Amino acid sequence: MIAKVVVENAAYSFDIAFSYQIPPAMQEDIRPGCRVLIPFGKSNRARQGLVMSLEEGEESKLKPIRMLLDLKPLLNEEQLWLTEYLHKRVFCTYYEAMRAVIPSGLTMKVKVMCSLGEQQAMPPEPSAAQQRILEYLKEQKKPVYIGQLLMDLGLTKNAPALKELFRIGAVVFSEDVREKTADSKIVMVRLSDGYADLLQSGKIRMTQVRKKVISLLEESPSASLKEVCYYAGTTRQTLDKMEEAGIISYYGRQIFRSPYADRHQEERTDSGVTLESSQQMALDTLWHLWEKKEEGPYPTALLYGVTGSGKSQVYLKLIEQVREKGEGVIILVPEISLTPQTVELFGRRFGKKVAVLHSGLTMAERADEYKRIQQGLADVVVGTRSAVFAPLKKLGLIVIDEEQEGAYASQSAPRYHAREIAKVRCRYHKAMLLLASATPSIETFYQAQKGKIHLVTLSKRYLGNQLPKVQIVDMNQSYGFDISQELTAELADNLQSNQQSIILLNRRGYHTAVKCNSCGEVIKCPNCSVALTYHHANRRMMCHYCGYSRDLEERCPNCGSELMGFNGSGTQRIEDELGRIFPQAQILRMDVDTTMSKLAHEVKFQEFAEGKYQIMVGTQMVAKGLNFPNVTLVGVLNADQSIYSQDFRGCERAFSLLTQVVGRCGRGTLPGRALIQTTSPDHPVIRQAAMQDYDGFYRDEIKTRKLALYPPFCTLCQVGFSGENEEYVRYGAMWFAREFQKKASGEYKDLPIRMMNPCEPVIARVAGKYRYCIVIKCRMEERFSRLMWEMLRAFDSEKKHKEVHIWVDLNGNDL
């Protein structure tokens, strides 16, 4: 029996399953999905690996596995299948795929430790460098992390002296392996099995305190150490003596860390939600589809309804019915800012059965929530993109709320889209996929129009509420003013009426650029090809791509002039401007800068809901999914921002954002109104968003997509290249384009492919690395996948490309 193992930190050129011998001691325990420590390469350096399968085969010439890291598989059968799927489909390495499937807190850290070898192996005449190493290790008296040794002695990573000592056996290396996060446990106390016999024997001296402890544990078979000490009025020392005497015993019980633990209530039998007739019809349709899921291909449905139509109430009822059948549910939201409201909605109904997964949790909290799901303690999972991998054993339904959002697409390896993972998981489990949105993605709505997925519509707002009245404000004659007179007047009316308002400006910071008024020089980031944004709170210029910052320039670095000025406005400036106009108003700013601390979104939104603030200013995090009944006014500043972007999805994003933010007002008993400030008042997207006319927008957009051959009429495959040397990056992109063209016109000439020439993206340099990209219009199928893998492995095998990183993104957001 041999193990097929994939290794961590593999390049494309050798990211394959390698064969390893299974030592006899591991034969019974090793399984696919277990992690192992293996000798790899000519140096036999220890590396982590993942066992993908066990096969019959000749093992005498194979290297043996050094260590089994998991006593039971970390990945189950489905998770291994997902790892393989991600590897093939989104062109990532096996280990990148595995790290997406499980939370980072469950990954292993392997440290190479260094210690002295046998005395007889010591060199008779060590060099000065060798002597320093030997003396250092002798002083430590225990194995030392090799990185610490190199740092303390000022040695380079490939220190020749250390290598020679290792070669002759004077120094030995070992591996220290541990999980990144350990389980959190509390000490529990229980009566020992033979405690009654001990008491009857008369050999144990009984005191009043001991009697109290025994009486307590007879009533409650187990209790925490803290509880026993408190209720029995005793100390740890007394309990230790009882344990030594054999009366009680200690054991550890895992506790799950969660910031939501204190508000998890008991599960209720009913949500208390009453559906209107249109909602009930939608629910009946969806439930009929769910009941038919075993009969054929897994059902996919789009719940398409105007903002405020009660889509979440419909799928809450659907989830209740799915759980009654004993199956679990995953609910995805696009951003952390939407998680608290969703957790509150489902927590009230399902109590402790709700698990939460998002990047705002600590590594340990994510690991513990994952374990709760894995152990069946939670069967309703709420979270952002990565929650789609939640290890529910019996999955019946996945709901993707605001399914059109770009946040569902990962921007780093593996570059997957949560919607695509949801599809394959539903197919695997014969579960149902429900997509919900007031502004569905063009691709999803196209499938619904073609009958490939079921379309369920809610055309009116809940309780008969009217859609907001929208006014388009032409800002062409308002140069220098961020807030129009019309919006100022409406804000004043709202403050007078004790109603709340939301202002959207999808740009953070105070000013978007610092510019010299003499020579026109714009202060740019030294690491990225973008202008620095001025932040007034700390008087610093900051890069929103790499995090670089520096003090505000008093003089132009180009010409020395002191005539420095500012361009553009961000949320910080709007907050200040509103504060000057309405000094009595309490203003809340919601952007990345104000929500960095843990659970900041939840705290701030709760305070706004309680009426502590009258105006909320924010970026796109205030535009989607939020429900504040007292918000009756929405103002949109600089609405043209994304319409004229080079991305083919620019108009779609602009329409969605405008429609969604307008839909935040008038959700209670009071009517809503919105003002959209723009310099393009006659632009079709602005007009259609103002009328909440998704159908009209879709008809226009789908014509453009078809004419230009964009999704859904093709798959856009972007191949990206990055590196610190611009010439190497450019050469790598040119090489790939040339070799790809040869294959595409040769053995793969049957594939429908259109390749664009290599070019720099809009932002050509990020974090000190130059970037090039190639866009390929194709049809994603098995042969195209094979072609891409051949190209990636060929590129990675060329020594000339050693300094260039390559990646692939399918239908990504950066196109």
Regions of interest found by a model, annotated:
Residues A11, F582-A585, F740-R754, E798-E803:
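Short secondary-structure junctions
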Residues L751-E781, L787-M791:
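C-terminal structured "cap/appendage" subdomains that terminate the fold
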Residues M1-S437, Q449-N465, V775, E782-W789, ...:
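Accessory, non-ATPase domains that flank or precede helicase/AAA+ motor cores in DNA-metabolism machines
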Residues D270-E276, Q280, P297-G720, N725-R730, ...:
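Inter-lobe coupling/hinge segments of SF2-like helicase ATPases
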Residues E727-K742:
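Extracytoplasmic/periplasmic
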